[in-house]
Amino acid sequence: MDKKEYIQSKIRDIKDFPKEGIIFKDITPLLMDVKGVEYVIDLLVENLGGQKVDKVVGMESRGFFFGMLLAQRLGAGFVPVRKKGKLPYKTLSQTYDLEYGQDVLEIHQDAIAKGEKVLIHDDILATGGTAEAVVKLVERLGGDIVQLDFLMELHFLNGREKLEGHPVYSIL
């Protein structure tokens, strides 16, 4: 079994969660598996091909799990992007569309310096709305986006279309 197959074997589908008709990708078995976590970080780092990264931006909240470990492995700082009102210092905000309404993401205004090389990470790429909002925040701060990477991608939702012009990598 290769690394990708091993990772896939540690993700379980939960039907009708959080609501009927949704199949939730539960990564908690993967998080509890030391070898699986190591494989995720290995594949994400290998895919970068030695590109310099100054900051890893993790999206709330499941992007924090691997984002922090990825930053450590790359020798980069970690920057959390959170929902409105969750960060204690001065922030920049970005509104994005949800299925029924809108939400707001925030980043500390001093989190990324102009010209810093930034890797954006989350666990899953679905519609691309959240990732697109994070791209806008990073660009407003002057960051240079190296890549967006994800543990998995729901291809049928066409999330990559919102991220055109930026390299996107997904393990699964």
Model-derived features: where do they sit?
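PRPP-associated nucleotide enzymes
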Residues: M1-L172
